[in-house]
From Swiss-Prot:
It comes from Pseudomonas aeruginosa (strain ATCC 15692 / DSM 22644 / CIP 104116 / JCM 14847 / LMG 12228 / 1C / PRS 101 / PAO1). This is ATP phosphoribosyltransferase regulatory subunit. Its main location: cytoplasm. Required for the first step of histidine biosynthesis. May allow the feedback regulation of ATP phosphoribosyltransferase activity by histidine. SUPFAM superfamilies: Class II aaRS and biotin synthetases (SSF55681).
Length: 394
């Protein structure tokens, strides 16, 4: 390997230098403190574990994004976590085994074998919150509200929300009795709003059901899209009506809590269709193709760990949150430069550090010129037999 190649990092893998690392850490602490104030308990999941446990209930997409290695100790296949959410769901279902609602949060690096999109990081810092044990829309409203408060605290500008409900399509597909292959083709067509393809794929269905499936490709926009949905899906099965009413209830609650927030609804939005079971949501900012935060309801995942529990939550990439946010997270780099040695110097330095001061002590051979590079704007000087803090000599 040439010397120059030793400095190269793989595509999508980044190192974070000061002061950016300090900004990310400050944001992490602020967000976790926010979660704590809402009653969410912090958990830490393994970076690597056996593949069958890591991917249980997660679907093919996560499998493709997971780096895999063989464990030398057992010979079993292991994976580096690409998504922390399934790990936290396992904690709730298998390790904690609480009967009532459980609020958990997390923050940690994940690793993606494939990026989510072009030019995105393969080593994001995933941060999120999950609420288990309550099936009501009130839980969805809580986690969406927490997500929006997080974005507000980070001062992410011009946020708008996209909301949908996969239960609407699930109910119609179930009523149509679609085969797995046709259901997948119809899913793809709806994501592209390809009305002609939707018409072709549903040509053999009863006219009423065919019309409702086509409507999913057209029911998108502001609050009026929900009212149009009520009218155009009036003959839909009961489970579709329940899903639509849940979405309307959530939308009304959010409009009351965040009256200035732009809300966009898409009844054909099937993000995470093979994973989510209810409402799905994402926050976007203008000029950025990918969502800044996203989540939804995923009630079935706990069953794979022996205990099905209602669940809803969201996640974000902390690096992106800091990049897009305008909050003043810069920590002023200042400190006190102390000489390498001196009578009573150690005691003076320790007193200052206990008081919360940043003190950098010179190493042998270093002079005051090194103080600026170390981020110091003051110095510890011996005057009249006492160590005193003074301005750094220019």
């Amino acid at each position: 390997m040439a010397t120059v190649d030793r400095w190269l990092l793989p595509d999508g893998i980044e190192e974070v230098l000061p002061p950016e690392a300090a900004r990310i850490e400050a944001a992490r602490r602020q967000v976790l403190d926010l979660f704590h104030r809402w009653g969410y308990e912090f958990v830490v999941t393994p970076h690597i574990e056996y593949l069958e446990s890591l991917l249980t209930g997660a679907g093919q997409d996560l499998d493709l994004r997971t780096f895999k290695v063989t464990d030398p100790a057992s010979g079993r296949l292991m994976g580096f976590r690409a998504d922390i959410t399934p790990q936290v769901a396992r904690m709730d279902a298998h390790s904690l085994r609480r009967e009532g609602p459980s609020r958990l949060c997390y923050a940690g690096s994940v690793l993606h074998a494939q990026p989510r999109a072009l030019s995105t990081s393969r080593s994001p810092i995933q941060l999120g919150a999950e609420l288990y044990g309550d099936p009501s829309p009130a839980s969805d409203v809580e986690v969406i509200s927490l997500m929006l408060e997080m974005l507000e605290m980070a001062e992410v500008p011009d946020v708008h929300m996209d909301l949908g409900h996969v239960g609407i399509y699930r109910g119609l597909a179930r009523a149509a009795g679609l085969s797995g292959e046709v259901e997948q083709q119809l899913f793809d067509a709806l994501q592209r709003k390809a009305v002609d393809e939707v018409e072709a794929l549903t040509a053999d269905l009863p006219a009423e059901l065919r019309g409702m499936l086509r409507a999913l490709a057209e029911l998108c926009g502001g609050r009026d899209a929900l009212e149009q949905g009520r009218a155009r899906l009036a003959a839909a099965p009961a489970d579709v009506q329940v899903a639509l009413n849940e979405l309307i209830e959530i939308a009304d609650s959010l409009a009351g809590r965040f009256p200035g927030l732009p809300l966009y609804f898409d009844l054909g939005e099937l993000r995470g269709y093979h994973y989510h079971t209810g409402v799905v949501f994402a926050a976007f900012v203008p000029g950025v193709g990918q969502s800044i935060a996203q989540g939804g309801r995923y009630d079935d995942i706990g069953a794979d760990f022996g205990r099905a529990r209602p669940a809803t939550g969201f996640s974000t990439d902390l690096k992106s949150l800091v990049t897009l946010g305008q909050a003043r997270l810069d920590q002023a780099v200042s400190g006190i430069w102390a000489p390498a040695e001196g009578a009573g110097l150690w005691q003076a330095v320790q007193r200052l550090r206990r008081d919360g001061q940043r003190v950098v002590q010179a190493l042998p051979g270093q002079d005051a010129a090194s103080a600026r590079e170390a981020g110091c704007d003051r110095q510890l000087a011996l005057r009249d037999g006492n160590w005193q803090v003074a301005p750094l000599a220019s």
